[in-house]
Amino acid sequence: MTDPSDDFAGNLADIPGSPADGRHTLAVIGAVDPALLDLVDLALAGQDAVVIRAGLHFGADGEAGSSDTDDDLVRLVSHSSAEGFDDEPVRLDVPMPYTCPTCSLREVLAAVAQDRVAQEPGGTTVVLLPAAIELAHLLPGLAEELAGTGVRLAGAAHVLDATTALDELLEHRLLSAFPGDCRCTGAVHLTNLGYADVVLALGRDENPAGADLIEHLRPHDALLLPGLDAPLLEALTTLTHDAAASLSRIHPATTSAWGGPDEHGVWTLDLSASLPFHPERLRSLVVELAGQGLCARGCFWLPSRPGRVCTWEVAGGAVSVGDAGTWAEVPAAPSGAGDGVAGEPRCHLVVTGVGDEEMREQVRRAFSRILLRPEEMAQALAWIGVDDGLGDWFGQESQEG
């Protein structure tokens, strides 16, 4: 790949960072809405760090003046340093080394971090990620690349606005972060809220229900900051990112019902059972189980696919099911998370909504109705190897696991 170190870091050399205190510190901040990252960029200006804004630019966009080539690019821009906000930013465009935008971003950030540690061993760099980057796809690999390099991967933050949280999490709002992007805002928020070390929630006073919804979807061990006046840089730099712990919080088989305030109608259901779902009843009751205007995540198992972790997610009005490997491959649950035995098949869905008690009870009833009844378990072995009618959801090959 083209190494961004020479040009970009040479321009950054005169921008002061933190006093040397050992390893170089790298923190990352993500959001779905790029306008929130603009606010964070301004808030960090004048603090003891170099702030780099990363963006993804695609040759097919036809953006005027974006580049001298038609290449897909990772763009690095820095306005902010300990000296304040500079109206004449440092900018570097790096051709994407891969067709995968997140893979390309990871490699570029690793190269920048390597150069920053050589330039300022005890300094601090904060990267504002491109909008709608999924932290779980970026950071585990970045942590591996930085291991033993003199760079400490500090905290990872996700920023969102409570005034738009209900809409972006519970309604279907499509993204267009890159060509062919078919994700919705809710799915990215749900994953990043569970994965991040720090959650920065703006607009909490303007929309208490949105603020409570964020609380319900935030892990108990993730730090919640209430706005831009909070010490974001300090919070990030005092943490060291643990990718394994973050992944375990969002794994379908080890996620937890974190809950939160209920004064403004936000609720969370924690549905769990050792019995499997009945394949035919799951198909017929999927709409009732998904509900409307809800977020849900978790796992289930089927007598027709007894060795497979089946996944369940509802976000942004869309339902998705999938396969997360075998039960033997499930990671250790976070400390204090759930009461299931690691590797033991189970159904566990965490469902969050706002108001609408009838919808909450509908989901609870659907979950109970879909489960195999105890008397049906005697014939559960008869499902193995039989077409369960869900091949279009999971694929026929996963039925053999």
Question: Where are the predicted features?
Answer:
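C-terminal accessory "lid"/substrate-recognition subdomains
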Residues: 2-11, 57-61, 158, 164-167, ...
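Nucleotide-state-sensitive switch-loop elements of NTP-binding domains
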Residues: 3-7, 12-15, 24-155, 162-168, ...
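A structural signal for short secondary-structure junctions
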Residues: 20-21, 304-305, 341-345
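A short, charged/proline- and glycine-enriched loop
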Residues: 20-26, 262-265
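Short, conserved charged micro-motifs
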Residues: 36-38, 207-211, 277-281, 357-364
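Short, solvent-exposed amphipathic alpha-helical segments in soluble enzyme
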Residues: 42-47, 142-144, 215-217, 286-290, ...
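Short cationic amphipathic helices and targeting signals
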Residues: 127, 199-200, 267-272, 346-354
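Generic C-terminus detector
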Residues: 340-401
